[in-house]
C-alpha cells in the first residue's frame, strides 16, 4: 500500500534535521526542467506562475542555485522541508526514526519538479506547481513532461503485491499526473468534511491538514489494509460509512455543542 501526498509551497530550511537524506529518483529530469526555468526572466516567471515580483525573484535565484548533486548544505529531506497545511498535520519532525523509515517505504510525495519523491529524498528549494503550463520538449505542460513516469514508478514500487493499493491524499492538480490507464493499483480516495452552515462540506484548509493527519495515522499505525483506515479518528474526525464507498472513504467532523 502506498500513500500519495501533494507537496507544499512553503518551505522550511531553518529548522535543523537529524536524519540523513536519500537521493531523489528523477534528478536528471529535474535538472532538465531547471535548465528550462533558467531561460525565464523574473517577469516571465511571475506571469507563468502568477507570483509577485518578490516571489518571482526569489525563485529565479533558486533555479540559479539548484545543483544536480544535492548535499547537506543545499538540501533537506523533503518531508521535513515542506511546510504547509498538509505537513502541519503530518508533523514529521515529531516522528520517530522507525516511523520515518516506514514512511520512506510507503509514502510518495508528488512534485512538479521531481516527479515523485520519497519522504527522505534530498529537496533543494524550488517552486514549480504541477499545474504550471511550462512548455517543454514533451509538450505544453508538466503532465506531458512526466508522461507515464510517475504511474510506472508506482507500479514498480508495488510489483510484488498481489493486491496493490494507492491511497490518494493528494490534490486533484497533483493526482492528475498519475495516469489511471497505466496504474495497475486500486485507488482509494479519502475525503474529509466539516459541518458548516447546516451541511457537511469540504473546507480546503481543514481538508489539507486532515490529509496530513491521515498520512501520520497510517505511518504510526503501520496501516496495510484499506479497512484499517476506517479507524482514523484524529482531530475529531470519524469514518462515515453511510456516505462512503469501497474506494471513497469519507470522514466527517461535527463541532462539539
From Swiss-Prot:
One example of a Gene Ontology biological process annotation: response to hydroperoxide
GO cellular component assignments: cytosol
InterPro entries the UniProt entry points to: YaaA
Source domain of life: Bacteria
HAMAP family the UniProt entry points to: UPF0246
NCBIfam families for the chain: PRK02101.1-3 (NF002542)
Family stated for the protein in its record: Belongs to the UPF0246 family.
Protein name per its UniProtKB record: UPF0246 protein Lcho_2652
Species name: Leptothrix cholodnii (strain ATCC 51168 / LMG 8142 / SP-6)
Taxonomic placement: Bacteria, Pseudomonadati, Pseudomonadota, Betaproteobacteria, Burkholderiales
